[in-house]
């Protein structure tokens, strides 16, 4: 599972880079969190928060919800890293924005 966690952590960095390059969104808090906690712990923390995520809104406005933590979490290969409650939170947030991942 450690290789899967490493892949997930790497993809969390890719999410940051993609959001910055594609949407000119500089996610400073997100960057600090993945630098300090790692990608998996950051994703779990963000999914546990009940408040609206500014980054999700910014990426929605840019029409790039595929670059969200929620979309990454729902990828088939990463689902085993998360609880059903966390997966449900990711699905709900994306569903509220009428986004359905295509994978």
How would you name each of these model-derived features?
Residues 10, 32, 41, 85-92:
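Polar/charged alpha-helical tracts
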């Amino acid at each position: 599972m450690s290789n899967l966690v490493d892949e997930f952590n790497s993809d969390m960095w890719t999410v940051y880079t993609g959001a910055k390059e594609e949407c000119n969104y500089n996610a400073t808090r997100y960057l600090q969190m993945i630098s300090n906690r790692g990608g998996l712990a950051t994703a779990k923390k963000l999914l546990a928060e009940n408040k609206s995520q500014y980054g999700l809104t910014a990426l929605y406005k840019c029409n790039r919800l595929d670059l969200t933590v929620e979309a990454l979490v729902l990828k088939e290969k990463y689902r085993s890293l998360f609880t059903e409650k966390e997966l449900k939170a990711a699905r709900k947030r994306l569903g509220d924005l009428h986004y359905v991942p295509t994978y």
